[in-house]
Amino acid sequence: MSTLMNIREYNSISMIKGPLMAIEGVTDAAYNELIEVEMPDGSKRRGIVVDSQSGVAIVQVFEGTTGVSPTQSKVRFLGRGLEVKISEEMLGRIFTPLGEPLDNGPQVLSGEKRDINGSPLNPSVREYPEEFIQTGVSAIDGLTSLLRGQKLPIFSGSGLPANQLAAQIAKQATVRGEESNFAVVFAAIGIRYDEALFFRRFFEETGAINRVAMFVTLANDPPSLKILTPKTALTLAEYLAYEKDMHILAILIDMTNYCEALRELSASKEEVPGRGGYPGYMYTDLAVTYERAGKVRGKKGSITQMPILTMPNDDITHPIPDLTGYITEGQIVLDRSLFNKGIYPPINVLASLSRLMRDGIGEGKTRDDHKDLSNQLFAAYARAQDIRGLAAIIGEDSLSDVDRKYLLFAEQFERKFINQGINENRDIETTLDIGWEVISMLPESEISLIRTEYIKKYHPNYRVKK
């Protein structure tokens, strides 16, 4: 809707329910149009139109409807969408999804106002992701590589260290060779206060805050604000990527809270629920959010997205991870059994996948042996898991010598390759060298997926001889 539309004012509030209000006599309201509520004491609150039919507009108020008077409050329709002033100055700062500072710093003065709903990318101008992003986490870099412009979610479970992994990736991730032009936009959606405090302290103590822009809503914030959080964060990401030629990693945590907020608002509007009680348009809503990542022809910058979500009851078939998996290009799955062994990060590499990995690794991108080594590590670990199951039935004493070596490999693979400290930043060469160290525990005859030239070049037995 044009921003030249006249401001219309109404005092015909007919219904107040949770964060929603109904205003009668409105025939020209537009979906997502910004509204302003003037309270009886003169203070103002903002909201947006979420439905309009038969002359009745349904609006959701960001700050909630407590204190709104049906007779004394006025509602103004402003004829434009919600806009937030964004700027490079936001790096190193913490904001609400409305662009208000949460770090006791000044308001953003420079920059430009942008509609937080963004503009859809024309598929014909998208470029295919091909550049490797180094996260410093071996299980990701070595086996489920992240590429510039990719959407790669992390599926976590309640109590698993998704927050720590998200903070570590935000601190360490970089595009090799373009470190100075890389930044992180971090959207924390409906998290607890102690979690918000952890992220803030971690970024400040490690110095990572200087290249991170944070947008935070807490668990007790209205659902409408939680829904705005990723939209505002991605609006800043688009500005930095496509206007300032920066490479942006957008981390969205926790998308489960986002979907719960969608469900809460849908229930308030008395919409017919879909699968699991979530609104039928949740797939579309998630797609709109996730598809704001990518590379654009003619633009030097890019947006890479890592949505992080909590699987209710560790159920990967739950609607939220299920729909997320359809839209994104792979998944990184955190595993409770590894966590119980004391492995950090507890990434289940066999359940994890990066669909674009093959196009962003290898000679000239990471290292020439990367593809072969990752294939061999996957295959060996998968066989070791089968042998573990067999050993639980017949006992280790009944296993062959080769099978016992696979068990030793699996133990060392988990302890040395997957496991690392939260402040341990491994470059890709270190990751691959550790991979060779653990795969060398197997007889060379079992290393069948790696070309002989790479075995002669990188296998520890041959390196020592040199």
From Swiss-Prot:
Which InterPro entries does the entry mention? Answer: ATP-synt_VA_C (IPR055190), ATPase_a/bsu_AS (IPR020003), ATPase_F1/V1/A1_a/bsu_N (IPR004100), ATPase_F1/V1/A1_a/bsu_nucl-bd (IPR000194), P-loop_NTPase (IPR027417), V-ATPase_su_B/beta (IPR022879)
Any one Gene Ontology biological process term? Answer: proton motive force-driven plasma membrane ATP synthesis
Which first-to-last residue range defines the signal peptide?
none
Q: Which residues form a coiled coil?
A: none
Q: How is this protein situated with respect to the membrane?
A: Peripheral membrane protein
What does the UniProt keyword field contain? Answer: ATP synthesis, Cell membrane, Hydrogen ion transport, Ion transport, Membrane, Transport
- One Pfam family this chain carries? ATP-synt_VA_C
Provide the primary localization: membrane
**What GO annotations for molecular function exist for this entry?**
ATP binding; proton-transporting ATP synthase activity, rotational mechanism; proton-transporting ATPase activity, rotational mechanism
Cellular component GO terms held in the UniProt record: plasma membrane
Q: What does the UniProt entry say about where the protein is found?
A: Cell membrane
Quote the function comment for this protein. Component of the A-type ATP synthase that produces ATP from ADP in the presence of a proton gradient across the membrane. The B chain is a regulatory subunit.
Question: What PANTHER family does the annotation carry?
Answer: V-TYPE PROTON ATPASE SUBUNIT B
**Subunit structure, per the record?**
Has multiple subunits with at least A(3), B(3), C, D, E, F, H, I and proteolipid K(x).
Q: Which family does the entry's similarity section mention?
A: Belongs to the ATPase alpha/beta chains family.
UniProt-recorded name of the protein: A-type ATP synthase subunit B
Species, as recorded: Sulfolobus acidocaldarius (strain ATCC 33909 / DSM 639 / JCM 8929 / NBRC 15157 / NCIMB 11770)
